[in-house]
């Protein structure tokens, strides 16, 4: 009887300690809910103009600027009125390459609705336009996206002629059969703001969904891929891995064999 009486308080203490530890874990998880594997603050870092010195002096100046910042091309001209179109006050920015986060007045003349900017030089009227005809104050131009290169059969010895490289950048466009069907391959066009945009063949859409690496336009992705040196950036590259949504997904092995071949896609429609 005495041994049982001594054991009960010890069990109660351990149960109470485990309950306190579990409660503290819940509180800390709710307070510090930042996932260290999530994508870094790529969308929060201010854009950097290509050719400008790095704004950091704590060691980050040795890193690639496009890892955290959107690199924009240098502006032509020295200020407002140097060939840029005016912007009507209150309208959304006409850019989608990172410049939409910059103050519009840095490059454009801000025009109030229904008025003409003071001191702005009137553009010459086209020959077919008569005086008195209202002219548009701002123009939104849609940028054309180059179509994705056609995929070619790789063969068993494709890895011997292709070279590996690292890629990173923002997803500009998505193409391939995976854009229409869960069973098709997904091609992404990425732009790092410095080099010409490239097309990369990732994997079937169901495999990306199963691995948690679904990509969308505007996302920052990076990884490793194989490229045919005879085609350079004009051809279709083949990804070995991709990091998206904070997840790192292996897509192909060193012989360019898709890892989804042994994964199976029986329940892909349910994911």
Curated annotation (Swiss-Prot):
A motif (MCR (magnetochrome) 1) lies at residues 48-71. Residues 32-271 are lumenal. It comes from Paramagnetospirillum magneticum (strain ATCC 700264 / AMB-1) (Magnetospirillum magneticum). Its cofactor is heme. Heme 1 binds at residues 65, 68-69. Keywords: Biomineralization, Heme, Iron, Magnetosome, Membrane, Metal-binding, Transmembrane, Transmembrane helix. GO terms for cellular component: magnetosome membrane. This bacteria makes up to 20 cubo-octahedral magnetosomes of about 45 nm in diameter which contain membrane-bound crystals of magnetite (Fe(3)O(4)). Required for correct biomineralization of the magnetosome, may be involved in redox control of biomineralization. May function with MamY, MamZ amd Mms6. It is found in: Magnetosome membrane. It holds the Pfam family MCR. Residues 1-10 are cytoplasmic. Heme 2 binds at residues 104, 107-108. This is Magnetosome protein MamX. InterPro entries: MCR, Multihaem_cyt_sf. A motif (MCR 2) lies at residues 87-110. It comes from the Bacteria. Binds 2 heme groups per subunit via the 2 magnetochrome (MCR) motifs. One of its GO terms (molecular function) is metal ion binding. It is a single-pass membrane protein. Belongs to the magnetosome MamX family. The chain crosses the membrane at residues 11-31. The gene is mamX.
